[in-house]
Each structure stands twice: as structure tokens, then as C-alpha cells.
């Protein structure tokens, strides 16, 4: 018996030492850097169609984090919807400023950042979405817009605020929240005629709804979104503009706790104008005001196919599940 107890004590001691060592390593290393990605890419041609699509995508996917509402420039600010356990996290200046922004970045360097989360300096932007499933054409549209003659993208001499990650975010960036690799081949988008496939593309590739509407940022799977814990079942914790906790909505088709009783028109109202069947949808839920009828239809069609999850959330007066 004494021998067994000694062995247990020894194992526990080793576990404590290992944990202390890991914490010390993470604290010292911080968020890691990587070799900058080098996508094979010719210069992006800024066609009128790409500039229009790029503006739509930037407004939908980038502006909430990077747009300074007072100046109208993509100069960045603190992400107030990130919960304190991640520390203080800031969106960078992505205007065309040559010193503080991306004015000297090449198209390929921007694509590398959008796809992997790694900048040309090798710094990993751990909170930045990784648009690994976005089509090459949509990515090119974003890049074209960021280099275009638009007021949002014009040079703004605002220095990006240094990140202040918590120990938890440092640990996560060294373990489960790592960057993704560049796609190994061309990335296309399904056609509008296949509503379910196109709806999935919108949800996981273009607008990345699963990031907030699955169970937890810490367990999301960027490469295989459907493998994220609680895929689209809600429960992820964010903050609103007043700093109060907000739990993301269950958007599976469960009729009791999800949106199974919503019509296509009601989904469109919620997405475009922030008006749900039972009341307004508050921040940090974005308003996708430029969604087309075809996009709303595709999203609705895809959501009907997602496995239903019974998970009540505070939206619509439903108590959150324990």
C-alpha cells in the first residue's frame, strides 16, 4: 500500500511540475509567431464587380471589428465584445497608411493573412477569423477593396494598439487555437442553384456565422466547422456595448429552443435589420443589411439541414440551459 501511495504521490508531483512548467513556458512565449505564409498569387485585378463585392464583404466581415465609427476609417479599436478571460484584444489598423496600416502590403501578403491569420511579420492574429473556406474570388474582392479608393480604406495615421492577451489566450494560442494552413488548391463557391450548398458556403466561408453561434470559441474547428462543439447550437459568451454578457442564439432548427419555427422572411428580417419574431436582436449581433434575397433563401435552406440541438438561450425570453 505504501508503495502505491508513493507512486501516486510521485505522479501527482510530476503532474504539478509539468503544469507549472507549461504555464511558465506559455507566459514567457506569449502568442507565438510563425513563418509568413506565401500564397502563389498574381496581383489582384480591381474590377468594378470585385470592388462592389469587396465593399459588401468588408462591411459584413471586417467593419464590426476594424471600423472606427467616429472617423469612418478601418483604423481599428478595442474589441469590446471579447470577454475578459481573453484579456484586452484590439483590431489592427487596416487602412492604406504606409506606417500604421497595410499600405505597403502586397496582395499575396493580404491573402496570406486572411486565409491563415498570420501576417507578413509572422505575428499570429489569434482572434482574427481565418477565411480558409472563402472562395478565391471573394478573397480577391476583399483585397481589391482594401487597396481601393474608398474612404474606409484611405490612410489613417492611427497606430495599432499592442495586444494584451491573458494567460488563457496565450495558452490557447499555443494549443487549440492555432493558425490554419493555406489551401492546397483553388477554392470555389457553389452556384446559387444549389441553395443548400450555397447556404453552407455563406455560413462557414463568407460570413462565418458558426464562429459565434457554436458552443465556444475555444472549441471551434476552423478547418471542419461542423466538428465544432455544439455546431450552431448557441451558448457562446460575448459582451454587448455596455459590457454585459450576451449568449449567442441557437440557430439550429429545434422548434423549442432554436429557430425551427421561423419563416424564411423572419430569418431575413433578423439578419438584415436585427428584428427577430419576438423582438430586437441586440449587439454584438451584426446586421447584414446587404444580403440578397438569394442569400437569405440559401441560408434558410441550409439551416433546415443542420442537425437540431436542444439548447435554450436567453434570446426571446428563453432561459439558458445549464
PLM regions: where:
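C-terminal capping alpha-helices of c-type cytochrome domains
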Residues: 23, 106-119, 130-156, 263-277, ...
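Extended amphipathic alpha-helical interaction segments
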Residues: 166, 186-188, 201, 211, ...
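Alpha-helical membrane-targeting segments
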Residues: 21-24, 28, 157-186, 314, ...
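C-type cytochrome heme-c attachment and multiheme electron-transfer modules
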Residues: 118, 176-192, 197, 245-276, ...
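N-terminal type II signal-anchor transmembrane helix
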Residues: 1-34
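The canonical Cys-X-X-Cys-His
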Residues: 54, 61-69, 142, 199-202, ...
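Gly/Gly-Pro-rich "capping" loops immediately C-terminal to redox-active cysteine motifs
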Residues: 44-45, 55, 70-107, 124-135, ...
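Electrostatic cytochrome c docking/interface patches
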Residues: 31-59, 73, 174-204
